Every structure is written in C-alpha cells, then in structure tokens.
Design a protein with these regions (language model features):
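Short, solvent-exposed mixed-charge patches
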Residues: 213-216, 233-235
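Composition- and surface-driven signal marking solvent-exposed, interaction-prone regions
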Residues: 9-12, 193-198
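Serine/threonine-rich low-complexity intrinsically disordered regions
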Residues: 15, 231-232
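Cell wall/extracellular polymer interaction/catalysis modules
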Residues: 16-175, 200-202, 206-210, 216-217, ...
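Surface-exposed coil/loop segments, especially low-complexity Tyr/Gly/Ser/Thr-rich stretches
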Residues: 1-14
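Well-ordered beta-strand positions
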Residues: 15-16, 183
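Glycine-centered flexibility sites
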Residues: 8-11, 105, 110, 180
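Active-site scaffold segments
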Residues: 161-195
Length: 235
C-alpha cells in the first residue's frame, strides 16, 4: 500500500447521524459538524463497521475446525465505507472474537480511531491497519488480559497492537491467527487493502450481539419457560 496514492481530494468524509445512519458529507471535522448545527459523530475519510456477536465461532472444513468459511461458522458482517464517495460501500466477512476467546479474550465493543501504520504488523499475516496507533484498547467486559501473549498487559483489562488483518489464505483462523486482532476473510482483506489505499486515518465501530438469559418468575403460572432470552446489541 502507498499511503499517498489517494488523499481525499474532494474534502468529503463520513459521519454518523443520531439515528446511527452513516452519511457522506462535505464536512471534514467534528468542529465543522458542530459549527453547522449538524448533529452526529464525525467518522473520518473512511469508516469500518464490524457487526459481530459474542456467540461467534469458527467452522469446520475438510474435517478440521477453525475456519472462517467452515461449516457451522458464525461470523461478523463487516461494512467498509470507503474514501471515494457515498457509493463506496463494500460488505465483507469478518471475525471479532479471536482464535480462542477463552484463552486469549477479545476487545470491547465501541468506536475506535484507527490509522495506517507505516511499519506494519510483524509475522506472516501482514497488515498496516491498526486501532489507536497500537495503543491500549479495553478488553471485553474489562476482563483481565490472561493471554499467554499479553506481555506487560498481563492481568490488565487492556490489549495493545490491535490490527485488522486476514485469516490464513485457506480461511483458517484458529491457533494463534488472532490473539486480539480483528479478522477479515482472505479475499476480503485484499479488497480492503485496495479500497483503503491512500487512507491514513479512519474509524472502526465494533458491535456485538449478546443474548442474556434472565429468570422469569411468573413462568410457572402461565406455562412459560422459567427464563427469558433477551438480545441486545452492544456498541
């Protein structure tokens, strides 16, 4: 990627309206929105939404578990709002709960600043797209980071060095493919790189659907199950 191939020559960016709609605008900062009485959150030259679930899981392929495109996989829907206009919107397949959430944990839901990192990610699965300049991102539910790869973050409710990168070329995402990072299917990551060429700063919205089971005290009187499933979107 060449970070200077494309630098928003028309001066237009994205913002999130109060109704959560993502809109292309000729305002290029939060101050511009505020000064012009536009209610919403400035998002930047590009914006990525990972719409995931706390129940995400990798699937089975060729008799082996751990694939983003495997049978039974529950994945995240990813929407990339690109830098080239209101119609520059692409949907992709992603994964937000790491290769083994019980072992590595995951990052929290929220809106994060992100950027093109010139040095890029180490290891086989290269990437230059990182959240918060490699700095701290809270863990899901503020749980202590007990990943064996946590380093100085061990026991703290944070992760650092959170990139957006591809699974293996086969779609395999198990093992140590992600101990915290956000994943895209391999072909989608290639598309992501092309669309994002020239972008230096952007934002990432991570949402996760969560189903909570709560007791239902009146169940015995009306023949209902003794609990109710409540589904919420954490963002």
């Amino acid at each position: 990627n060449n970070p200077v191939n494309y630098i928003d020559p028309d001066g237009m960016d994205w913002y999130e309206a109060n109704n959560k709609e993502i809109i292309w605008t000729n305002y290029t900062s939060q101050k511009d929105l505020d000064d012009n009485k536009i209610e919403g959150k400035y998002l930047g030259q590009a914006h990525v939404v990972f719409s995931g679930s706390r129940d995400e899981r990798l699937g089975k392929k060729n008799g082996k578990n751990g694939y983003i495109d495997g049978e039974g996989a529950i994945t995240a829907n990813v929407t990339l709002y690109g830098p080239r206009g209101a119609d520059d919107i692409t949907t992709m397949t992603g994964f937000t709960m790491t290769s083994n959430v019980n072992k590595y944990g995951a990052i929290t839901e929220g809106l994060f600043n992100a950027n093109y990192d010139v040095n890029g990610k180490s290891g086989i699965l290269k990437s230059n797209w990182v959240l918060n300049h490699r700095k701290e991102i809270p863990t899901m539910d503020n749980k202590p980071n007990q990943s064996p790869y946590a380093g100085e973050n061990y026991g703290k409710p944070i992760k650092t060095g959170i990139f957006i990168h591809s699974t293996n070329s086969s779609g395999y995402a198990g093992g140590t493919v992600s101990t915290g990072c956000l994943l895209l299917a391999p072909q989608d990551f290639q598309t992501f790189n092309k669309i994002m060429s020239g972008v230096r700063n952007f934002t990432v919205r991570l949402t996760k659907e969560q189903t909570i089971i709560v007791p239902f005290p009146l169940a015995v009187f009306i023949g209902h199950e003794p609990f109710i499933r409540l589904t919420t979107i954490r963002r």
